[in-house]
A protein has these predicted regions:
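NTP/phosphate- and nucleic-acid-binding module
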Residues: 1-327
Length: 327
């Protein structure tokens, strides 16, 4: 099913391939030791690097690449646990996407022509996905024939600030690969049973999600997310040591801060920091050194005036802890 998109080679007469998906590894982790019904649900997560030979014309920045990182998890469970586990994953999606202020729509992707397993199994699993998502009061649309080859799935399409949608999260219900890998658990009756499995990703491709949120925020990330949160800008050479001390205090408090002690005009340094979307700029001069204060500016050009370093630290740490989107 993935052969045409895989990178393969032959070494000493043996065929080798770079993995295009993480799923077989999840199967092998489960199969590495015996399991009882008491172990289930068993949730196995990883950040796995995968390679897929996409056509060159389909490649698009961070959005479509040939090597990317998936935040994969494989959840092994009994049939009785399927609905609650699906809903647990949806709650995880809500928690993560809400942090970024992202809305989503849901698609139920059904059995493709090129599938494994019986029609009856597919229909039963599709009904479980429907029941789980509607039981949470969420709407969905049906995407006929777009399921994975091993099972139906719920696809979560997040919407960016331009109204574009990107498929990121997915919940794939799979009773086929546990069969192919001969996975088992010992039931309450002492007999061997076959588990069922969920494949889930929240971000999908980490690289693509970074691209999505970069465009969504137009580079002006919330304070908690931005790579450099504070830039300290001394007005004169006399304030360099004071600026460096402030920067170190910020770093010691866990804030990502830098100072700009170049011999450039203050206006130039402020404009450059604004272009870099730095949330806060601390302008420090002779008066600030005398009073032990900092003059605070935002990337939007707002002048918040002078405040003590402790007051500014408290403000920053509060915004970071709350994951505030306002800056």
């Amino acid at each position: 099913h993935y052969k045409n998109n895989m990178y393969t080679t032959v070494i000493d007469g043996e065929d080798y391939a770079i993995k295009p998906m993480n799923c077989p590894g999840g199967m092998l982790v489960y199969a590495s030791e015996p399991h009882s019904y008491r172990d289930l649900p068993l949730r196995v997560g990883e950040l796995g690097l995968v390679h897929r030979h996409e056509l060159s014309g389909a490649l698009h920045g961070l959005f479509r690449v040939r090597c990317f990182t998936q935040d994969d998890a494989h959840i092994f469970m009994t049939r009785e646990q399927m609905e609650s586990e699906i809903q647990n994953v949806v709650r995880l999606f809500d928690e993560v996407y809400n942090v970024f202020g992202l809305k989503y729509t849901v698609e139920l992707s059904t059995m493709p022509e090129d599938h494994i397993g019986t029609v009856e199994e597919w229909e039963a699993n599709q009904e479980i996905l429907k029941k789980a998502i509607t039981g949470m009061g969420k709407d969905f649309v049906v995407n006929e024939g777009d399921g994975a080859f091993y099972g139906p799935k719920l696809d979560f399409h997040i919407e960016d600030c331009l109204g574009r949608t990107w498929q990121c999260g997915t919940i794939q219900l799979d009773s086929q690969l546990p069969e192919r890998f001969n996975l088992e658990y010992t039931g309450e009756d002492g007999q061997k049973h076959r588990p069922v499995m969920i494949h889930r990703v929240v971000f999908g491709s980490i690289e693509r999600f970074i691209g999505v949120i970069t465009e969504h925020f137009a580079g002006a990330f919330p304070l908690w997310l931005t790579p450099v949160q504070v830039k300290v800008l001394p007005v004169t050479d006399r304030a360099h040591e004071y600026a460096k001390g402030l920067t170190q205090k910020l770093v010691d408090a866990g804030i990502r801060a830098e100072d700009d002690c170049r011999s450039e005009k203050l206006g130039y340094k402020i404009r450059e920091a604004q272009m870099q979307k730095i949330p806060y700029m601390l302008v420090v001069g002779d008066r600030d050194m005398e009073n032990g204060t900092v003059s605070v500016r935002t990337r939007k050009g707002e002048d918040l005036g002078a405040m003590t370093m402790d007051a500014f630290l408290s403000k920053c740490l509060s915004e970071i802890a709350s994951k505030s989107k306002d800056i």
